[in-house]
Amino acid sequence: LNYAIEDSWDEKEFDKNSQIVQKLLLHAASAKNVPFSVCKATSFGHKHLFKKINAQQPLTDCEKLAHERVINRFRECCKVAKAHDVGLLIDAEEYNMQFAVDQIVMDLMNEFNTSKAVVYNTVQLYLVDGNERLQQMHSRATTESFHLGLKLVRGAYMQKERKRAQKLGLTSTICKTKSDTDANFNQAVAYC
């Protein structure tokens, strides 16, 4: 079950989104053929917060509290997922937010994926550094002894990523061709 809300704007809406995901997890637990519920990190917190963390900029006291609330929203969903043996898949975000999301999700995996994978992250292989990220996640899971839950995808934000790189005069974060993306994806599948 997928709760496809992203880009919410206020704390009440973020709380409501977390409650909806928890209800979807309970529904998935009662449905034999629904092993996962899916949500977006941006349904639990402001995009600007993820972007700021991703850019490793210092957070204000208010932003630190907002970040804690984001983590707590995720944590409540993870508790429901673990209690009812249903997977919670965190869908991918744009590149300028994804590292911040990865940090949260990996910390939650460390907390909830002790006996099996319950929390899952998404690795986008259209990103040039997709396999490097995958290997870093695997290394951390091995070092810290938790089960790594992953969904491998080619990617979803190609036009946005190209436009962002051009606008900012940056090297593109995505592979140049579909065949490069396919090679990245195949390498990731072989690694797993």
Locate the predicted segments by residue.
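Positively charged, amphipathic and often flexible ligand-engagement surfaces
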Residues: N2-C192
